[in-house]
């Protein structure tokens, strides 16, 4: 099955739909601790929970993807020798400073893996790096799921 390539765009704020902007605001409330729960955050910005969950993993303020942040990639890898090593090789070649690697016990031949790394010295952009990882044989999914300012 062919993997669908994800594309990222830099879009001017006033062109974004209100639900996407409110999702960013709700995420910022949670990050700063101004809201303790998703329910509280979405109520404060007048956004439905379903809209929040629809957009939360796909929208980030621009500064959060710039150099000097940590990024967490969640991946599903086939349980075969060398696949994780190849993923780490791509990250090392891009000069990502790896902070943590977590791998769950494989179930039905698939293992969930998260890798968190700093982007300060990153050579290349995150889109190209994740694309190269997705293209590896044995990589089923790659999703940037977390990030924070260093």
Curated annotation (Swiss-Prot):
Belongs to the UPF0735 family. Signal peptide: none annotated. Residues 72-147 form the ACT domain. InterPro entries: ACT-like_dom_sf (IPR045865), ACT_dom (IPR002912), UPF0735_ACT_dom-cont (IPR008310). PROSITE patterns: ACT. It holds the Pfam family ACT_4. Transmembrane segments: none annotated. This is UPF0735 ACT domain-containing protein PTH_1602. It comes from the Bacteria.
């Amino acid at each position: 099955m062919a993997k669908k390539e994800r594309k990222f765009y830099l879009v001017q704020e006033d062109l974004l739909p209100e639900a996407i902007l409110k999702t960013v605001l709700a995420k910022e409330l949670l990050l700063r601790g101004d809201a303790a729960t998703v329910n509280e955050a979405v109520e404060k910005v007048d956004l439905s929970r379903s809209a929040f969950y629809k957009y939360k993993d796909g929208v980030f303020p621009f500064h959060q993807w710039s150099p000097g942040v940590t990024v967490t990639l969640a991946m599903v890898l086939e349980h075969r020798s060398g696949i994780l090593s190849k993923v780490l090789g791509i990250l090392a070649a891009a000069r990502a400073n790896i902070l943590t690697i977590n791998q769950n016990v494989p179930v039905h031949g698939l293992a969930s893996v998260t890798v968190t790394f700093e982007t300060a010295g990153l050579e290349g952009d995150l889109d190209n790096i994740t694309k190269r990882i997705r293209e590896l044989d044995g990589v089923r999914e790659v999703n940037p799921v977390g990030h924070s300012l260093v």
